[in-house]
């Protein structure tokens, strides 16, 4: 309601004031203005009653405008107001204050109907006559007037004086020098010989309801009103400028919807704007756009009329509060002023500037901007760097826009020129040849048609065509129109021929253009996975930690990673091993030993479970991870070579991946081919006896890519891992929560663990995106309109064969394996990721390069000469035998002996409690083994426990050990044990000990510090045996004894009074003897 009143007061208070002034000026006898309070009261009452029917209010204000502009006379005004407000008799009665004293509304209720009467200067009119209004069309358009003048000129060609008289009469009527009746008499007499023209002239006269001339005061014919002939539903039609005759209302539309469209047509006076609004509604009806887009776009059409906008929201079942949230989310975060300017936040508007004076602050704009503040106005906007796919899409849109712009401009020019041609065709033949046009051809836009003609006729001949159109339009227009139509059809034909190519380019580049990280991440990742970069990063982090955190530099790790998902950890190892087996089968024994024996020691894994899992790679994809790994009492060892042959058989087919096989692969393949022939009989016999090994035939050795693709499945994990069972105490190599592993290594191992961690993190992030895949897939719902138009792109058909696993993570894992085998190319792999993950999985694009780098580091580790000695030291350090305090130091010294002088020593620590893996760079000159803070605390705890127990300390000689006891206080006839026992017994009987003293040891300075407010107390046992009264008497005696001593002490002090001594005594003695 408040909003409606505000609109009424702000937008239409001027019109109400003008209405009051007009009524008072014409009909008030004294010419005095009405009180302003009456106007405000009427506006408030009008707003309160018409807040839910805005179209009634619009009709009322239009009639007031018509009265003010002298379009209707006063009786017409009263009649229309009575029809508009026929449902509001109280408003009609209140309106009497604006009428002259001789006019007044008289209402007499009779049921639902009422009778309207007027009191006039000649008396009241009690019997109203029937008033049936005939409403002609509004004045004809400009072109019809020109055609009428041309026909009159041709009719009066033989008598030019009559034509001049007609022109003079029209000029006098325009200047209010003659009345309408005089003009009508003159024209009728001049066109007496041409009755058809005289009758046509009457169509141009203001004879409709809004164009009746106002008679003199006091001579108005008073007419009654028949409400059945003139109802409120016709008001909107009377107020519109034109109404097509071929419009017919739909029978299924409600009254509210019908009134809404009529009011929209009245508000959107421009026909093209009204058609654009109907097109927007049509898009919503067809399901191309949703309700939010409809409301946000429709606000631009109807925001000027608040009542109509509320009706539109009610039709869409959307509240104003919901619209604000939709519109604010669709628009900018800042308030807008037009399509280009945004209001800056307060902190941006209040920037200090010392170079301005008062005048500059008054005229310069600091609130609204349309240019970024971080860019220079001279240099223009800084365009964001685009990827090649974005460049292709931009170029495609520019080509489409160019064709659309030319076709639209040509169509508009043809339409405009045809209107001029039709107007010229209505002229006589003699006038057509001499008819000329002004510059610009009288079109609303001069630039559009000029650019179109320059585009068709080139710039050299365009000026000649402009002059010809202005001087000889009758001859030039047909030629230009035909040429433009020919060119327009040519451009449309070319556009249709280019549509398939444009659609193909769009299909190839659209998804990639949305993935902005695609290209740049590949370039960065190639640098980030290099050994040089990883080693330099470790050195930089170590120096920064030492500079900013000097106290933590000895114990903190440069890198710390968390491996809390064992399934992803297993999958990471499986992927690296698969790449090595597939592409580099040489040295598999060392690789298998490294993964099955060395890697579990670094990550706290169970060797048996991890070894069974990796047997799927080293023994074949058909290996059962839950089956026992033995045949009888001996393990099956011959199957590994056969499974390797199956996995590396893909190398025999270089046509699949388009690459040449390496020398090592070729050598291994020849060796296996020669060995398979001699071993086939033994293999067959072994498989028959055990039943666990499948014989390998020539067909299996030469299987095609389709068979390899079918054999690639997601690796099956052991049941104990999938079910998360607790196998406490089942295996020898089980890791406890308080057992951590510390190993030492060199640069190749450090680089491998860094690459291994990157691979683990990307697979782990891929697993976490499992929930978002379904959300992304819901957005790929086909639009029925696009399917009907055959422009819908089914991206599923463009993908290669998608694996059929349980989850999307497993499907993606199998796709990575196919990429490693070369079955799927890089482009198809990226399209698969974009289809399921959108732009979230861009880190997986280079996973094959990352796996290759990790496999390369594994080969560097196992092919190094010191690998055998380092692995033996690692296994010896990880043994379950008890270690001494200096074993870690000796282990480190042995590792340093194997390294070159310029090589870096690394320490790898696995903290099983937090599932974290730390890497630290060690100094070669540092002879003290650096330990983490948790390790130091654990060692200190162990030291305190050893200190308290009664046993000999290791590596300490007791040859020269002397006891610090005083021999004179020890009874000679007793031993030390007897003396200690006697003293303890006597102490327990005579005193009560309460131990509360606490101490701590600083790890950095090794200082023993006692905690404040902690102490040991001894209580004599005799006090504990006393009764309460005896205890109080004893305490009072002691208190009195202290008092006497205190008084004597105070008297000996010079300058101290007794009063002061008494006060201090009471304060201190009571504190000393509080029980």
From Swiss-Prot:
Q: Which GO terms describe its biological process?
A: negative regulation of transcription by RNA polymerase II; transcription initiation-coupled chromatin remodeling
**Which residues are recorded with the post-translational modification Phosphoserine?**
641, 643
* SUPFAM superfamilies found in the cross-reference section: PAH2 domain
The segments labelled Disordered in the record are 647-700
Q: Name one GO molecular function term.
A: molecular adaptor activity
Q: Where is the composition biased (Basic and acidic residues)?
A: 658-675
> Boundaries of each PAH domain copy?
28-102, 138-208, 243-319
Q: Where in the cell is it found?
A: Nucleus
Name-wise, this protein is: Paired amphipathic helix protein pst2
What GO cellular component term, any one, is given?
Rpd3S complex
* Role description: Has a role in chromatin assembly and chromosome segregation. Involved in the deacetylation of histones.
Domain of life of the organism in this record?
A: Eukaryota
| Pfam families, per the entry | PAH, Sin3_corepress, Sin3a_C
- Compositional bias, Low complexity, is annotated for 676-691
Q: What are the entry keywords?
A: Chromatin regulator, Nucleus, Phosphoprotein, Repeat, Transcription, Transcription regulation
Name the PROSITE patterns for this protein: PAH
Q: Which InterPro entries does the UniProt entry name for this protein?
A: HDAC_interact_dom, PAH, PAH_sf, Sin3-like, Sin3_C
């Amino acid at each position: 309601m408040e909003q409606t009143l505000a609109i009424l007061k702000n937008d239409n208070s001027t019109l109400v004031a003008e209405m009051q002034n007009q009524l008072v000026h014409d009909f008030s006898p004294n010419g005095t203005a009405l009180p302003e309070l009456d106007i405000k009261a009427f506006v408030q009452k009008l707003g309160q009653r018409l807040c839910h029917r805005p179209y009634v209010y619009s009709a009322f204000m239009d009639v007031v405008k018509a009265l003010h502009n002298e379009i209707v006379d006063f009786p017409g005004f009263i009649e229309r107001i009575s029809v508009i407000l026929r449902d509001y008799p109280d408003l009609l009665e209140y309106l009497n204050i604006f009428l002259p004293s001789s006019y007044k509304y008289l209402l007499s209720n009779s049921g639902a109907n009422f009778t309207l009467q007027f009191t006039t200067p000649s008396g009241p009119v009690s019997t109203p006559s029937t008033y049936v209004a005939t409403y002609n069309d509004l004045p004809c358009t400009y072109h019809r007037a020109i055609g009428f003048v041309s026909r009159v000129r041709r009719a009066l060609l033989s008598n030019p004086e009559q034509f001049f008289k007609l022109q003079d009469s029209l000029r006098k009527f325009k200047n209010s020098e003659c009345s309408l009746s005089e003009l009508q008499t003159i024209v009728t007499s001049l066109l007496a010989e041409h009755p058809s023209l005289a009758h046509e002239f009457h169509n141009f006269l203001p004879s409709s309801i809004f164009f009746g001339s106002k008679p003199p005061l006091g001579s108005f014919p008073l007419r009654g009103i028949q409400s059945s002939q003139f109802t409120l539903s016709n008001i909107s039609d009377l107020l519109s400028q034109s109404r097509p005759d071929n419009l017919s209302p739909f029978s299924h539309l409600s009254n509210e919807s019908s009134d809404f469209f009529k009011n929209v047509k009245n508000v959107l006076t421009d026909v093209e704007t009204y058609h654009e609004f109907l097109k927007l509604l049509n898009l919503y009806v067809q399901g191309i756009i949703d309700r939010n887009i409809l409301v946000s776009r429709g606000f631009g059409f109807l925001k000027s009329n608040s009542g109509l906008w509320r009706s539109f929201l009610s039709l869409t079942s959307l509240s104003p509060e919901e619209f604000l949230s939709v519109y604010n989310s669709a628009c900018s975060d800042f308030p807008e002023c037009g399509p280009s300017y945004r209001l800056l936040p307060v902190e941006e508007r209040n920037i200090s500037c010392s170079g301005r004076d008062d005048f500059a602050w008054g005229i310069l704009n600091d609130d609204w901007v349309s240019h970024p503040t971080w860019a220079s106005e001279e240099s223009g906007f800084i365009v964001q760097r685009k990827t090649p796919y974005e460049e292709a899409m931009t170029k495609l849109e520019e080509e489409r826009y160019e064709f659309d712009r030319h076709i639209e401009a040509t169509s508009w020019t043809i339409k405009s020129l045809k209107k001029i041609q039709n107007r010229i065709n209505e002229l006589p033949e003699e006038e057509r040849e001499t008819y000329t046009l002004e510059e610009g051809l009288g079109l609303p836009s001069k630039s559009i048609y000029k650019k179109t003609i320059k585009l068709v006729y080139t710039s050299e001949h365009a000026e000649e065509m402009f002059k010809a159109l202005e001087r000889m339009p009758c001859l030039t227009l047909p030629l230009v129109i035909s040429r433009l139509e020919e060119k327009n059809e040519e451009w449309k034909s070319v556009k249709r021929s280019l549509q398939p190519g444009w659609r193909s380019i769009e299909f190839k580049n659209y998804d990639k253009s949305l993935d902005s990280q695609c290209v740049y991440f590949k370039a960065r990742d190639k640098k980030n996975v290099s050994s040089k970069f990883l080693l330099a990063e470790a050195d930089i982090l170590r120096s920064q930690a030492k500079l900013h955190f000097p106290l933590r530099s000895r114990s903190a790790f440069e890198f710390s990673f968390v491996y809390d998902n064992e399934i992803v950890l297993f999958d990471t190892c499986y992927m690296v091993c698969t790449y090595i087996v597939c592409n580099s089968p040489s040295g598999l024994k060392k690789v298998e030993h490294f993964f099955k024996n060395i890697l579990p020691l670094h990550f706290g894994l169970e060797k048996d479970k991890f070894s069974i899992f990796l047997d799927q790679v080293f023994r074949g994809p058909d290996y059962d991870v839950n089956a026992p790994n033995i045949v009888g009492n001996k393990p099956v060892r011959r199957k590994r070579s056969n499974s390797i042959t199956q996995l590396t058989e893909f190398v025999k087919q270089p046509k699949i991946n388009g690459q040449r096989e390496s020398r090592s692969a070729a050598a291994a393949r020849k060796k296996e081919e020669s060995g398979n022939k001699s071993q086939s009989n033994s293999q067959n016999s072994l498989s028959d006896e055990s039943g666990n090994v499948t014989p390998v035939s020539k067909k299996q050795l030469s299987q095609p890519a389709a068979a390899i693709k079918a054999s690639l499945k997601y690796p099956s994990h052991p049941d104990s891992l999938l079910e998360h069972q607790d196998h406490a105490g089942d295996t020898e190599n089980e890791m406890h929560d308080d057992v951590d592993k510390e190993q030492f290594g060199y640069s190749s191992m450090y680089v491998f663990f860094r690459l291994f961690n990157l691979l683990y993190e990307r697979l782990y992030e891929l697993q976490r995106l499992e929930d978002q895949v379904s959300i992304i897939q819901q957005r790929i719902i086909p639009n029925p309109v696009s399917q009907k138009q055959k422009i819908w792109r089914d991206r599923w058909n463009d993908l290669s064969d998608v694996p059929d696993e349980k989850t999307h993570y497993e499907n993606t894992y199998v796709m990575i394996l196919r990429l490693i085998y070369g079955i799927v190319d890089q482009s198809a792999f990226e399209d698969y990721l974009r289809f399921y993950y959108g732009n979230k999985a861009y880190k997986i694009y280079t996973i094959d390069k990352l796996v290759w780098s990790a496999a390369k580091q594994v080969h560097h580790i196992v092919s190094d000469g010191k690998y055998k000695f380092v692995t033996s030291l690692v296994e010896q350090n990880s043994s379950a035998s008890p270690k001494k305090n200096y074993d870690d130091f000796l282990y480190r010294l042995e590792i340093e002996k194997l390294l070159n002088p310029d090589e870096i020593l690394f320490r790898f620590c696995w903290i099983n409690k937090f599932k974290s893996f730390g890497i630290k760079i060690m100094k070669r000159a540092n002879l003290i083994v650096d330990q983490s803070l948790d390790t130091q605390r654990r060692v200190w705890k162990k030291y305190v426990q050893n200190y308290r127990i009664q046993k000999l300390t290791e590596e300490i000689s007791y040859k020269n050990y002397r006891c610090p006891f005083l021999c004179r206080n020890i009874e000679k006839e007793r031993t030390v044990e007897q003396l200690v026992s006697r003293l303890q017994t006597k102490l327990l009987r005579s005193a009560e000990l309460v131990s509360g003293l606490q101490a701590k040891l600083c790890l950095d300075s090794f200082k023993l510090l006692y905690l404040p407010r902690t102490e040991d107390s001894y209580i004599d046992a005799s006090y504990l045996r006393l009764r309460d009264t005896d205890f109080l008497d004893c305490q009072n005696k002691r208190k009195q004894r202290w008092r006497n001593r205190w008084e004597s002490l105070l008297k000996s002090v010079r300058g101290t009074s007794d009063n002061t001594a008494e006060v201090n005594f009471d304060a201190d003695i009571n504190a000393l003897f509080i029980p």
